[in-house]
């Protein structure tokens, strides 16, 4: 008969070892009835021992796993290769090491501790003393904190005293008293006479009017009547109005304008036009003031003045003006009523209160240094000898920017001032008319070799159209026209002469529109042609300088290599035009 199958986690010693469902997994011969303790079926159908660390099987036998320091002796006993010796307070009993302790040391929960009683306590792993004021721990020593009058003297507590307290020979604290204090009765008392008395153990003062004791503050006060007051804790006479005190606290009469004290008499002090010999009266001169029949001060007035009735039923003297003649009132002052074309000058250097009338001007009109009206002239306009407006002025020509018609050596091609470069720019509305020519005066271009096949001149301008230092042309040779020379003062703006940035954009590569290409001739000889390329707002200059321009012009003359040897570089004049920036 089969037994009930145990749970899956227990060993079933009854054959067969099959599951509750399904056929037997392995054949079996006889059912070995064995204890499940220490046995297991692993793998299925095989009876084996159930072992755990440090037990193991080795060569079919049960064996013991051993770590470092353990071994088996010849008798098969487990031994340790490390022999431990100890010294007191440690002791060894068989395989155990223990610690001998005595009070106050003890072992609690396997740890060595110190048994303590108050005021000792273990805090944060350290033995300390609990203390309450006045006991304290200072410099790792228990001490007593003191505060005056208690102090420590010669390692003993002592009492500091000062008069009237003192220590007697019997080491007692006594009080030294002087009149009116007394200690005759063994207690501190006061000797007193009237008006001081004692009532219910309290000192009081016998008083009568005008003295009284204020009920709310128990302070002695003085009752004051009319004309008397207490001020800054002092009893004094109450004064008001013109009565006061002098520097010696004497009562006096204060006097103001028109009054003074002389020989302890109050005197009316007057000045002209008043007189006070016997009575106060007004002195009148020969002016318009007079005393009328009603004994009132009145005024005589003539033409240009009149009296008018004010809103408060008073009469006021006013100037009579004729508004139709250009006069008017400005608040309380007479003013000129300026019409169209006239105004008042507020920018006068004479005085900020002086505003002369002047002609009101608009665009195109100004004042000269003499204050006369003149016409404002823009660029290209001037006055001729007759004073008429004319176009152009050769002595101050703001329509021509040039090098002069015949400049000195002013340009660098290969070396400083090795070339005379002529360039004239004339503003013609939205166009600029230009003439250019170049002549070598020194260096290798004064006698060219066969290796030279081109000459380039670069002009670079900043955002204001001012020639930059990194140009081939020297700055001081380039300015507005003044006769056959240039202005002495450097110019600051010539944007109107610059190539238009929309028409000739500064791009990474030159475009066809940026270039003006034509044929010119060496020395003006038609048998010696050269190609002139004028580039407007080109970018080739950025490879030669770190300072980038806003506008630029470059002029390049080129010819076949090997030609014109020993010749001097000199070009004929070439005229061209371009669209202006402004």
Swiss-Prot record:
Region annotation Head: where it falls in the sequence: 399-582
Claim: Phosphoprotein is one of the keywords in the record: yes
Residues of the signal peptide: none
Domain of life: Viruses
InterPro entries: Adeno_fibre, Adeno_fibre_knob, Adenobir_fibre_prot_rpt/shaft, Adenovirus_pIV-like_att, Attachment_protein_shaft_sf
SUPFAM superfamilies: Fibre shaft of virus attachment proteins, Virus attachment protein globular domain
Region annotation (Tail (penton base attachment)) ranges: 1-44
UniProt main location, coarse: virion
Keyword annotations: Capsid protein, Glycoprotein, Host nucleus, Host-virus interaction, Late protein, Phosphoprotein, Repeat, Viral attachment to host adhesion receptor, Viral attachment to host cell, Virion, Virus entry into host cell
Pfam families referenced in this protein's UniProt entry, alphabetically: Adeno_knob (PF00541), Adeno_shaft (PF00608)
Family to which the UniProt record says this protein belongs: Belongs to the adenoviridae fiber family.
Anything else known: All late proteins expressed from the major late promoter are produced by alternative splicing and alternative polyadenylation of the same gene giving rise to non-overlapping ORFs. A leader sequence is present in the N-terminus of all these mRNAs and is recognized by the viral shutoff protein to provide expression although conventional translation via ribosome scanning from the cap has been shut off in the host cell.
Domain notes: The tail region anchors the fiber to penton base capsomers, whereas the shaft, built from several repeated motifs, allows the knob to protrude from the virion.
Assembly: Homotrimer; arranged in a triple beta-spiral. Interacts with host receptor CXADR. Interacts (via N-terminal tail region) with pentons.
Protein name per UniProt: Fiber protein
Species of the source: Human adenovirus C serotype 2
């Amino acid at each position: 008969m089969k037994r009930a199958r145990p749970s899956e986690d227990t060993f079933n010693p009854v054959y067969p070892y099959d599951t509750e469902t399904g056929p037997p997994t392995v054949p079996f011969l006889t059912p070995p009835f064995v204890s499940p303790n220490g046995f297991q079926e692993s793998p299925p159908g095989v009876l084996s021992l159930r072992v755990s660390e440090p037990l193991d099987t080795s060569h079919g036998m049960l064996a013991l796993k051993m770590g470092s320091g353990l071994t088996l002796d010849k008798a098969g006993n487990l031994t340790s290769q490390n022999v431990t010796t100890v010294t007191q307070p440690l002791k060894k009993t068989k395989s155990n090491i223990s610690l001998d302790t005595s009070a106050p040391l003890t072992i609690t929960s396997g740890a060595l501790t110190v048994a303590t009683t108050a005021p000792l306590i273990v805090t944060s792993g350290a033995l300390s003393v609990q203390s309450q004021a006045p006991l304290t721990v200072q410099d790792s020593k228990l001490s007593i904190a003191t505060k005056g009058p208690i102090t420590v003297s010669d390692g003993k507590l002592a009492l500091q005293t000062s008069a009237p307290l003192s220590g007697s020979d019997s080491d007692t604290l006594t009080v030294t008293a002087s009149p009116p204090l007394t200690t005759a009765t063994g207690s501190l008392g006061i000797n007193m006479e009237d008006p001081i008395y004692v009532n219910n153990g309290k000192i009081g003062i016998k008083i009568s009017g005008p003295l009284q004791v204020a009920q709310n503050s128990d302070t002695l006060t003085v009752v004051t009547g009319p004309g008397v007051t207490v001020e800054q804790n002092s009893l004094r006479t109450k004064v008001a109005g013109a009565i006061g005190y002098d520097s010696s606290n004497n009562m006096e009469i204060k006097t103001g304008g028109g009054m003074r004290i002389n020989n302890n008499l109050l005197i009316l002090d007057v000045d002209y036009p008043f007189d006070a010999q016997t009575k106060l009266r007004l002195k009148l001169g020969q002016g318009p003031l007079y005393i009328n029949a009603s004994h009132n001060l009145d005024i005589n007035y003539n033409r240009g003045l009149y009296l008018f009735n004010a809103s408060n039923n008073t009469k006021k003297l006013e100037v009579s003006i004729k508004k139709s003649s250009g006069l008017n009132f400005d608040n309380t002052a007479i003013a000129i009523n300026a019409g169209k074309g006239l105004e008042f000058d507020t920018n006068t250097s004479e005085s900020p209160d002086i505003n002369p009338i002047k002609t009101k001007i608009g665009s195109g009109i100004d004042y000269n240094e003499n204050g006369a009206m003149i016409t404002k002239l823009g660029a290209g306009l001037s006055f001729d000898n007759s004073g008429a407006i004319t176009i152009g002025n050769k002595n101050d020509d703001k329509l021509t920017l040039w090098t002069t018609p015949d400049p000195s050596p002013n340009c660098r091609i290969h070396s400083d001032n090795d070339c005379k470069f002529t360039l004239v720019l004339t503003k013609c509305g939205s166009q600029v008319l230009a003439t250019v020519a170049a002549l070598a005066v020194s260096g290798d271009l004064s006698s060219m070799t066969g290796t030279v096949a081109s000459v380039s001149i670069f002009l670079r301008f900043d955002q204001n159209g001012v020639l930059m230092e990194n140009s081939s042309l020297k700055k001081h040779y380039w300015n507005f026209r003044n006769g056959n020379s240039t202005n002495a003062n450097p110019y600051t703006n010539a944007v109107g002469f610059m190539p238009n940035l929309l028409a000739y954009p500064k791009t990474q590569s030159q475009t066809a529109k940026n270039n003006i290409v034509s044929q010119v001739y060496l020395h003006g000889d038609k048998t010696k042609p050269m190609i002139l390329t004028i580039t407007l707002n080109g970018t080739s200059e950025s490879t030669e300088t770190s300072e980038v321009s806003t506008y630029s012009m470059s002029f390049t003359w080129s010819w076949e290599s090997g030609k014109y040897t020993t010749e001097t570089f000199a070009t004929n004049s070439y005229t061209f035009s371009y669209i202006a920036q402004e």
